[in-house]
Amino acid sequence: MNLDVSDLIKKVELSKEVHLKLEDDKRFFNGEEEILYLEAPTLDGVVSISEDILTLNGKLSAEIELSCSRCLQKFKYHVDTEVHESFTNNPQCEDDEIMLLEDEVIDVTEVIENNIIIELPIKRLCKENCKGLCQQCGANLNFSKCKCEKDIDPRLAKLKDFFSTQ
């Protein structure tokens, strides 16, 4: 989805309110996994211009589906974050934080995806006390107990007897 900012670049306007809902895309790939939008992401904010720098400030809200790091179960995750992005159409700008505009439009899809990726938790858990999967049979320990016997290191078997007698 593209946002036309030609009026701002031509200084016809100095700021513009933005209310966008990303309806086109249902999913995106973040380099590790495919992320599914359960609800279309919304971006509400203001685009303003100062000299040759466009600034987008707003609030991003999205409902996405993630996979739990322990049990691989899909779960719903809500993203609410502030968006602060800067753009320019000046190719001589050397600031790494400022993105270069093409054809006087802002690629809002890229802005939304990048901000969602930044907000993703490092350890994605369906619930705080997720028990994960059994390492032997693969059963989801959140829903059932497996019947696997625990392997005991023979070198430490004597310690088990030692602590049970005291």
Label the model's feature ranges.
Residues M1-Q166:
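Structured interface patches
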